[in-house]
């Protein structure tokens, strides 16, 4: 039985690697949503801190960075270029397909001409001739899927996009998209206490698709005193969010978490999770408690909707 332990090193490469198409990246990435203003809108309050955080990424061996044209909008992509261009040794993934109308307001738009504009503008802001990984942020229910997927396939064929990913999708969504292009990544909600995307994760494992969980640090009520999460946290002198993140990493070899922040100290705290090794016994206990919390969440959602 493996022993639960924590390394003192702050190095994303401790998490191992995962393939995203033909690209191999360290399995601890970074989500650049938080280097913006409140409500993921406008410029950040402390731009210098955000730039310093972004510049720290390659020093910690983080080589997969996820952003979106809607973060700001445009702000996140612009800051990435300012801090890290020409991205030596880095894979920059971005997303498109959402319209912003204000803070915390997001609306799907899958019109083919709009998607093409999104790709071209992201290329311009990032200063690249090809986007490493472009992800459809949301499938637009008001636009025929054939139109959305065909346009994405065309842009890939033209060389504007190297690889294609999807976000917030079902297994059936992935299978439908795969009729038009290879899907190399899926970005869905997943964490210790929210398992609604287990079937999607299983499909990704079968197909060798990188699974990018958003909101990977969540631990809900398990962060309270007396839980196994609390006990492991105290034993290793690590935060409950670090333990929750280490559980996500160990849940599957295709997992590629991208915790984000606008501060260097928080970034380093997150990366330390890459050096935590949970024993099989501790992992199983966390898994069991997490499933229990997820069941409670689902029950509460049913009550609210009834």
From Swiss-Prot:
Q: Which Pfam family, giving just one, matches this sequence? A: Aldo_ket_red
Classification via SUPFAM superfamilies: NAD(P)-linked oxidoreductase
Which superkingdom is the protein from? Answer: Eukaryota
The UniProt entry lists the main location of this chain as cytoplasm
User: Where, subcellularly, is it found?
Assistant: Cytoplasm; Nucleus
Q: Which UniProt keywords apply?
A: Cytoplasm, Nucleus, Oxidoreductase
Query: What name goes with this protein?
Result: Uncharacterized oxidoreductase C215.11c
